[in-house]
């Protein structure tokens, strides 16, 4: 690229539209798929699906010391859980190292790169000099304009970056951002052992994969200018850039583990969120469509664009995520929820659920899910259905039983025993409980609380009529009989 270039804007090539759109998600497998990465993947996926284009997945595993198979599995598992399907085969960057080196040598032959023989000591001296002058350290290699080095001697390949003029990126999120070429350095393309650097690999892979839109976190904005210098040196098509602000914690600081910067698997397993809730929340975390909060997948694909991605960092709010999850729990299919909740219940009650148990759990969902915010809350609320005999009673429930009016549970049990299996229905159960409350001259709540404690061992449960119906006549009467033997003041 000619050094006398004036300022150039990085949208010289027409922006791809429709089926020509190609986006990519390119995580490094050095850890889990964190929540910020999941949002980046979602935005790329939605943009591609909105345009009817392609969404590609590339695993940037060039850091061999830190890349692990477990991390790769976690990333792929997280993507599948979020239902962010990708087109074609997964690309593994390390396997393409020969192609990356080929481009570097091609650039060397064309004069766009040069061999640099600076030693580590020389680089350290240059760095110390920059620090002493309180200047940013940028490599200005004396080998840029020399060709008398020995190709057999240890060296790196550096990009011959432009030194004059400026570059402006017309970023779809950040707007126009300009950097003087003098602020850029001749970064390394190939290390002394011949391995390619991240900066080279990313540019080559994006070009070869046909990526038209690079949508990523704004912590990569500075890299874009260096990558653009390489793209122009190769005379390749320039992608459209969209650098999305990072997610911050509720206190406005960079998102960390204490804020919720956990792996996607933690939101699924430990916290019990549904993928549609996480997707909806991440979509609204930095992008908006008027006042719409609940956005279906079909609506998200139809509405998503880059014009409505905000420039300011979004703040992660667990309460909003929980509220969204509660909505999606209420909307979810009961059999699906039962399948998701069953393993949690098995862990809580210490036994496997058989088919009859799972059928009961599905039947109970309508009563369990209205007030729940997570799968864990549903599981906790359902344990009374599968409690062992004798049923555990928590401290608060024991206090309720101990303070119940003498004879109240016995009278209630006797009245319920008068209902046979054919009359163990919601209507008849409600009538019986209300009749006993009236006979005891108590409000319904005063009777329902000890009844709930006796039947569930807890003070919080689904409605008492639902509890009686779900437990059935035999179990309900057995638990009521057992509860009458709790010692006073227990």
Curated annotation (Swiss-Prot):
UniProt keywords, alphabetically: Aminoacyl-tRNA synthetase, ATP-binding, Cytoplasm, Ligase, Nucleotide-binding, Protein biosynthesis
Keyword Aminoacyl-tRNA synthetase (UniProt): yes
InterPro entries found in the cross-reference section: aa-tRNA-synth_I_cd-bd, aa-tRNA-synth_I_codon-bd_sub2, aa-tRNA-synth_I_CS, aa_tRNA-synth_I_cd-bd_sf, Glu-tRNA-ligase_bac/mito, Glu/Gln-tRNA-synth, Glu/Gln-tRNA-synth_Ib_cat-dom, GluQ/Sye
Annotated Gene3D superfamilies: 1.10.10.350, HUPs
A UniProt-annotated Pfam family: tRNA-synt_1c
Name the record gives this protein: Glutamate--tRNA ligase 1
EC number: 6.1.1.17
GO cellular component: cytosol
UniProt motif 'HIGH' region: location: 27-37
Catalytic activity: tRNA(Glu) + L-glutamate + ATP = L-glutamyl-tRNA(Glu) + AMP + diphosphate
Oligomeric and partner information: Monomer.
Subcellular location: Cytoplasm
Species, as recorded: Sphingopyxis alaskensis (strain DSM 13593 / LMG 18877 / RB2256)
Positions that bind ATP: 257
GO BP: any one term: glutamyl-tRNA aminoacylation
Chain span(s) of sequence motif 'KMSKS' region: 254-258
HAMAP family in alphabetical order: Glu_tRNA_synth_type1 (MF_00022)
Source domain of life: Bacteria
């Amino acid at each position: 690229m000619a050094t006398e270039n004036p300022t150039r804007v990085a949208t010289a090539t027409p922006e791809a539209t429709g089926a020509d759109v190609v986006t990519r998600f390119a995580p490094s497998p050095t850890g889990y798929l964190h929540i910020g990465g999941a949002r980046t993947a979602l935005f790329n996926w939605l943009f591609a699906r909105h345009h009817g284009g392609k969404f590609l997945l590339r695993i940037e595993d060039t850091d061999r010391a830190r890349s692990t198979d477990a991390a790769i599995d976690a990333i792929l598992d997280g993507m599948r859980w979020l239902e962010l399907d990708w087109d074609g085969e997964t690309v593994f960057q390390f396997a393409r190292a020969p192609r990356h080196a080929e481009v570097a040598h091609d650039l060397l032959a064309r004069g766009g790169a040069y061999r640099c023989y600076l030693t580590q000591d020389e680089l350290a001296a240059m760095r110390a000099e920059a620090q002493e002058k309180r200047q940013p350290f940028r490599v200005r290699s004396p080998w840029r304009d020399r060709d008398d080095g020995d190709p057999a001697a240890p060296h790196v390949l550096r990009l011959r970056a432009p030194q004059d003029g400026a570059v402006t990126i017309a970023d779809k999120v950040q707007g126009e951002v300009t950097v003087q070429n003098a602020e850029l350095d001749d970064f390394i393309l190939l290390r002394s052992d011949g391995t390619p650097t991240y900066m080279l690999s990313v540019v080559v892979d994006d070009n070869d994969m046909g990526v038209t839109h690079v949508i990523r976190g704004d912590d990569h904005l500075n890299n874009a200018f260096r990558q653009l210098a390489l793209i122009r040196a190769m005379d390749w098509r320039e992608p459209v850039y969209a650098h999305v602000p990072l997610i911050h914690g509720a206190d406005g600081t960079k998102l960390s583990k204490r804020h919720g910067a956990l792996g996607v698997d933690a939101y699924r397993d430990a916290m019990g969120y549904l993928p549609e809730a996480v997707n909806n929340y991440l979509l609204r975390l930095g992008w908006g469509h008027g006042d719409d909060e609940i956005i279906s997948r079909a609506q998200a694909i139809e509405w998503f664009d880059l014009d409505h991605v905000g420039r300011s960092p979004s703040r992660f709010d667990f309460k909003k995520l929980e509220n969204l999850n509660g909505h999606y729990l209420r909307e979810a299919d009961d059999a699906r929820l039962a399948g998701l909740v069953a393993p949690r219940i098995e862990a809580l009650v210490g036994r496997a659920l058989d088919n009859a148990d799972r059928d009961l759990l599905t039947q109970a969902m309508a009563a369990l899910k209205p007030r729940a915010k997570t799968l864990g809350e549903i599981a906790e609320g359902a344990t009374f259905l599968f409690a062992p005999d004798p049923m555990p009673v928590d401290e608060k429930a024991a206090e309720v039983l101990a303070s119940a009016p003498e004879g109240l549970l016995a009278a209630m049990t006797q009245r319920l025993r008068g209902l046979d299996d054919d009359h163990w229905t919601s209507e008849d159960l409600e009538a019986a409980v209300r009749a006993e409350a009236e006979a005891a001259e108590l409000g319904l709540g005063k009777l329902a609380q000890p009844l709930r404690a006796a039947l569930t061992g807890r003070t919080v449960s689904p409605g008492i009529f639902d509890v009686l119906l779900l437990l059935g006549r035999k179990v309900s009467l057995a638990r009521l009989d057992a509860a009458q033997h709790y010692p006073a003041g227990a």
